[in-house]
């Protein structure tokens, strides 16, 4: 059984996919994005439902860090933490600068590119906030989810197993970004 919820969040909708085989008692959950901060209560209710049913979030994916994709997740997680309704989160997929550097430094033949050689001020523009992404990742690390964060998913195309289902994150390749 598969259930897909498209959760309206103005211009930053998010998705909640629930999946289980007939013989399974609990649903597997995949969450994509989190909507705007104004939708934090809806995101919290989803987390509460998952937690009360004794389920986990098998994979949470942030497609990119615009405020209309991360702020509902961040504020919803904060509310759920206060009420002790954060379910176990098995894996969180997002792209971060730290993940980018780790990936490229690990490639054969690549010259080390220390982060110190690149100085980019942390700035916010309307609708885009690197500071908000930093706050979210800090929260996730403080909550003990650091080892569950996959911080570089560009051209990953790795299989993500959710129960007996296989999912793929599809993204442009490094070449397409150059």
Positions of PLM-derived features:
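Divalent metal-coordination and catalytic microenvironments
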Residues: 8, 33, 64, 92, ...
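Amphipathic repeat-derived elements
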Residues: 18-20, 31-36, 42-43, 64-65, ...
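Flexible, acidic/histidine-containing loops and adjacent segments that form or flank the divalent-metal
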Residues: 1-2, 76-178
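Active-site metal-binding motif and surrounding structural segment of the metallo-beta-lactamase
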Residues: 25-28, 41-93
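A short acidic (Asp/Glu
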Residues: 16-17, 69-75, 103-106
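Conserved beta-strand hairpin/beta-sheet module of binuclear metal-dependent hydrolase folds
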Residues: 1-56
């Amino acid at each position: 059984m598969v259930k897909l919820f498209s959760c309206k969040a103005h211009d930053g909708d998010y998705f909640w996919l629930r999946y289980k085989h007939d013989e399974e008692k609990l649903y597997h959950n995949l969450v994509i994005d989190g909507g705007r901060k104004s939708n934090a209560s809806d995101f919290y209710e989803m987390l509460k439902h998952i937690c009360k049913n004794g389920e986990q979030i098998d994979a949470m994916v942030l497609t990119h860090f615009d405020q209309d994709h991360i702020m509902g997740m961040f504020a919803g997680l904060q509310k759920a933490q206060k009420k002790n309704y954060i379910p176990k989160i098995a894996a969180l997929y997002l792209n971060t600068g730290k993940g980018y550097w780790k990936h490229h430094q690990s490639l054969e033949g690549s010259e080390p590119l220390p982060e110190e050689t690149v100085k980019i001020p942390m700035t916010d523009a309307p609708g885009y906030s690197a500071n908000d992404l930093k706050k979210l990742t800090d929260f996730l690390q403080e909550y003990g989810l650091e080892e569950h964060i996959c911080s570089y998913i560009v051209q990953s195309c790795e299989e993500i197993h959710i129960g007996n289902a296989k999912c793929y994150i599809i993204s442009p390749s490094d070449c397409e970004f150059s």
